[in-house]
Amino acid sequence: MFRSRSWFGGPWGGRPKNRLSLEHLKYLYSILEKNTTVSESNRGLLVESLRCIAEILIWGDQHDSLVFDFFLEKNMLSYFLHIMRQKSGGSSFVCVQLLQTLNILFENIRNETSLYYLLSNNHVNSIMVHKFDFSDEDVMGYYILFLKTLSLKLNTHTIHFFYNEHTNDFPLYTEAIKFFNHPESMVRIAVRTISLNVYKVQNPSMLRFIRDKTAAPYFSNLVWFIGKHILELDTCVRTDIDHQSNQKLSNLVAEHLDHLHYLSDILLLEIKDLNAVLTEHLLHKLFVPLYIFSLTPAPPPPSLAVVTQNLAAVLNRNVDIDIQEMHNPRVSSIVALFLLSLVFLVVSHAPLVHALAWVILNGDHSVFKEGAAEILNSYVEHREVVVPGFGEPDESLEQALDTVTGQSSSSSYALSEDSGVESSSPATTELDSQADAVEAEQIKLRNITDEEKQLLQKSSSSTKADFAEMAKPFLDTVLHALDCTENDYLALLSLCLIYAMSHNRGIKNEWFEQVLAKSTRGAFSYKTALIEHLLNIITQSSQPSSRIRLITVEIALELLVTFTRPSSDDSRCITAAQQDLLFSARNQSMVVIRNFYKSEDIFLDLFEDEYNEMRKAQLNVEFLCMDSTILLPPTGTPLTGINFTRRLPCGEVEKARRAIRVYFLLRRTCQKFLNEKESLLPLTNVVNLVQVENVLDLNNSDLIACTVVAKDSSKQRRFLVIDALQLILVEPDAKLLGWGVAKFVGFLQDVEVQGDKDDSRCLHITVHRGGVTHNRTPLLSAKFLFDDHIRCMAAKQRLTKGRSKARQKKMYQIAQLIEIPGQMDSPVYAVGGTMVASSSGGSGNSSGSSSRSSHHRPMFSTANRVPGFAAVLRGSNSAGVSRTQMAPNRSIEGIRNESAGRSRRRSPSSTSGSNLRADHSDRERSPSVSMGSHSSSQSRENSQPRSTGNRSRESSPRMPRPRSEEIPLEDFQHSRNNSPHSRGNPSPASRSHTPIRVLHYDQLSGHSGSPREASLGGTNALLSQLNGLNREVLPTQSSEETSFIGSDGNEATGGSEGRRRGAIETV
């Protein structure tokens, strides 16, 4: 009734209260003594006892040495072994706990003496060789984990506990490698870890045992296992044409990469004898008979080969046709190129990669009989000759290891004998199987006619001549794969192989280029042929309908730079004709971009985004070859999840992206050939931008006070400043009067402004992230509250116009980059219907003046400035930015004020001709008004077809101004150059993106009370200079216009003495 519920209840009650103590271990030992036989009734008790013993031993390792003394004194490991060997019910359940206990014990022991105690009585080796029931997944998992934990404890001192030199017994290694081909991937990974931990121990006798007893059978079985895996991979590629088995193919590629990295790790340990054996097996049992053999053309049907062989016997001619080769396993050329690329990308062991590269670059069909002995002899001394052949070993690894353990120490598993048997016995069997077929075909040959004999003789001789001419058949196959007439399916993998060979550390670059440069066919050079193939790919990629992926173009350009790189004394190894082809491809790519320049609304965002992506993404061919999708035919749908650069474009937007990226890649390559540095990209000069927390001089700048209400209803008082390219929210500096700290900065081109229906003082402003990005979260999305609706409207107007101007400026920069006709010399790029011709007759028009006129009106002038526009601070000799437009309904007073202000701010560094400047200065000094009246009348007559009647600004519709009427600006010089934090090192002047012929002006003045010139003749001369023709302006009926720079209504007299700063005037 009151029986204890614990595992230790019953007759063995009275356990110690302290769970981690020597007394508790003695108590657990008494339980093991009384439960030597495992049954269903006591297996739970035994499991709990084993778990507690492990805890006490780990505690005693760090706190009480008497615990281990008692454990060894009672030889408690023998009880563990006794429990394992029982076949009674529940033993498998207890074995799992035993293996887990041992694993925890060896994993957590830190004291070397305690470890030596545990390993000294050889019970651990007995546990390793015990025949567990590996059909139980738990037993298998804990057993391999136990072996892995022990391998981590291996070093030069502990190796003697595991390897017995007298008996040539090494159970930790031999038992582990038996599971190298286990179906569970975690088990295979653990086996590789165990073997590498064993190889790392530099013990000569142990390494000699591995080389003599286990290396050949292990590596031969491992190579065969990898080969079978490759055949499965090839089957998956052949059947998965529609990208339906992507996950399976990805797993197969990942598994093969694990194999390659494992082999590379073994070779990097630089164990000379072990590497020699592994290199022989890899080269002659896998790479040459399977990879290289798959690069050869598909053989004829066996029946035709037998007929040809028999005909040769009748005609007494020698035709070299190997019947066995026709039945050798092979993979598709796609898979062969992919696998060879992986070898050169992962493995860098010089004897192996050099021999394999020599076979590809210099080898012919004789390599399938002789192997790569010529190259390997220079690396390996006393090397046995091995005939290449891909086949299953005669013995499984488990059988071979059992045989080795039963043999005496003098026996040796000879590599040459093993290799000879593996390669010769399949051949003998194959020849015997073909003997009857040969005899049957000989009977048929007696009945063929003379004409048939002649045809067969010609075919056999031509085949022989073709093989003789193809001195380097494998290299020719690689180069022929670069043909991109249909698509770049084969070309991409061929480029990956060439790139991997040219960048492998085990292959000397000088030798690689020497082999390509020489040839036996006269003046023909494989290097020249390779460069021509690369240029063909580049030329085809710049066509509008090209089916070449971006990654192919990038690798081709990288290889072109690599193979034309100048040596120390010579110039680039490229002819003028080849260089012209490259530049022609760049020009063609610009032609393709021009088709998208006006057709895509988001062209500017695409352009900037592709440039940023190209700068961030560095070419990594090894990472590319980890992607299994390059093994499948190129697809154009994004539904497969394939990266954009590794598939064909889908839709007009992606076609535009591809065209832009191709142009960027070609432009960068051409600049490398010309030794030029990029000076026009990126479109935005980051150096001259305002950054967050910059301290800005806000004196003489227009600010609009506002309250920013965020999504979480938090409110912040800020001042809105609008620059040429940026929207800036500033907070006044607490220490310096008239200075502010930038708290938020965003590009005007990414601003979206919406008014509030309920509140005329409110604007909803969203600043999006620049470019086409997956992160759709905006940089700022908030409600802006202004003091009154006038300031709200002013802010909206400035933001809208600023966004338009910023985007137009960058679009003009792009037009300069891609050399759109009509955009190279003038910033005015025509839009249909916006340019009209002026009358040829009329006084005041000189013969050299332009025949085209357009209407302009001032955008960023100070004559009728609205609060919110960030006036450029006056600096020493720093160029400002001004855009000028003239509208036919502007008042004469506004024109007078504007012209007077601009005449004072005219820059002496203007690029206009000297004659034009002299003419302008003469007209400014002339007080005549009659000429202005006549010119204005002429201008008004010319503009009659465009405007009918006089309408006020409020009543006229707000039509968007055409692009052709705009003059792009220079970048503003930021006022942070005058900051006290940066006075010591002023930043350089902002880079100008405007063309040469654009007029330059000094910075706009922030003061509204400066004296004004009232000369109408000077106004007309300035406006006619800006418009490129001599025109005269007459006063027209003006519309009402509100100005924030204050004058009372005495403006009509032309005097400025009646002006009062701060008042609002209506003109």
From Swiss-Prot:
Segments of skewed composition (Low complexity): 409-418, 927-947
Transmembrane segments: 333-353
Residues of the signal peptide: none
InterPro entries: CLEC16A/TT9, CLEC16A/TT9_C, CLEC16A/TT9_N
Disruption phenotype: Pupal lethal. Larval neuromuscular junctions (NMJ) display an increase in synaptic bouton number and synaptic area. In Garland cells endosome trafficking is impaired. Early and late endosomes are unable to progress into mature degradative endosomes and lysosomes resulting in enlarged endosomal compartments. In larvae, starvation-induced autophagosomes are significantly decreased in size. However, autophagosomes are able to form and can mature via fusion with endosomes and lysosomes.
Membrane topology type: Single-pass membrane protein
Polar residues bias (residue ranges): 421-432, 876-888, 975-993
Keywords of this entry: Autophagy, Cytoplasmic vesicle, Endosome, Golgi apparatus, Membrane, Transmembrane, Transmembrane helix
Molecular function terms from GO: small GTPase binding
Chief localization: membrane
Highest taxon listed in the record's lineage: Eukaryota
Subcellular location: Cytoplasmic vesicle, Autophagosome membrane; Late endosome membrane; Golgi apparatus membrane
Bias (Basic and acidic residues): 917-926, 951-974, 1057-1067
Chain residue ranges for the region called Disordered: 409-434, 837-861, 876-993, 1037-1067
Gene Ontology CC entries for this record: autophagosome membrane; Golgi apparatus; Golgi membrane; late endosome; late endosome membrane; membrane
Biological processes, Gene Ontology terms: autophagy; endosomal transport; endosome to lysosome transport; regulation of autophagosome maturation; vacuolar transport
Residues in FPL domain copies: 50-199
Similarity section: Belongs to the CLEC16A/gop-1 family.
Role noted for this protein: Required for mitophagy, autophagy and endosome maturation, possibly by acting in multiple membrane trafficking pathways. Required for endosome trafficking and maturation. Functions with the class C Vps-HOPS complex member Vps16a to promote endosomal maturation into degradative late endosomes and lysosomes. In response to starvation, functions at an early stage of autophagy to promote autophagosome growth and efficient autophagy. Essential for the recruitment of lva-positive Golgi elements to autophagosomes.
Quaternary structure and interacting proteins, as annotated: Interacts with the class C Vps-HOPS complex components; Car, Dor and Vps16a.
Name this polypeptide is given: Protein CLEC16A homolog
